[in-house]
Amino acid sequence: MARKTNTRKKRVKKNIEAGVAHIRSTFNNTIVTLTDTHGNALSWSSAGALGFRGSRKSTPFAAQMAAETAAKAAMEHGLKTLEVTVKGPGAGREAAIRALQAAGLEVTAIRDVTPVPHNGCRPPKRRRV
């Protein structure tokens, strides 16, 4: 029986000018996803995916690196302008936005979509260190 040659599909270059950057910044990690205007993902990155572990994962520097990697990958698809939606209370919020601008993407709007409870679940107890 003949062996199949292992051919990888080449990634299709989409030609998308405008998109949305979804930044999810928690106390433990920062995830950056760049999508087109319909919400189809072009690229994503996170502090954990870049090899940051433990307490270094939640730093602004890790968020900056995640945003840079996602931006470079999305710019290969022709992305130029962005709307930014930020969710969560983490340390990497501003750093990720600044990194997207520094990568050469034009930020047109910044929207905070952090979910705020109308007195829903009881929050976790206070830490005593």
Swiss-Prot record:
SUPFAM superfamilies: Translational machinery components (SSF53137). InterPro entries: Ribosomal_uS11, Ribosomal_uS11_bac-type, Ribosomal_uS11_CS, Ribosomal_uS11_sf. GO terms for biological process: translation. GO terms for cellular component: ribonucleoprotein complex; ribosome. GO terms for molecular function: rRNA binding; structural constituent of ribosome. Keywords: Ribonucleoprotein, Ribosomal protein, RNA-binding, rRNA-binding. Belongs to the universal ribosomal protein uS11 family. Located on the platform of the 30S subunit, it bridges several disparate RNA helices of the 16S rRNA. Forms part of the Shine-Dalgarno cleft in the 70S ribosome. Part of the 30S ribosomal subunit. Interacts with proteins S7 and S18. Binds to IF-3. This is Small ribosomal subunit protein uS11. It comes from Bacillus anthracis.
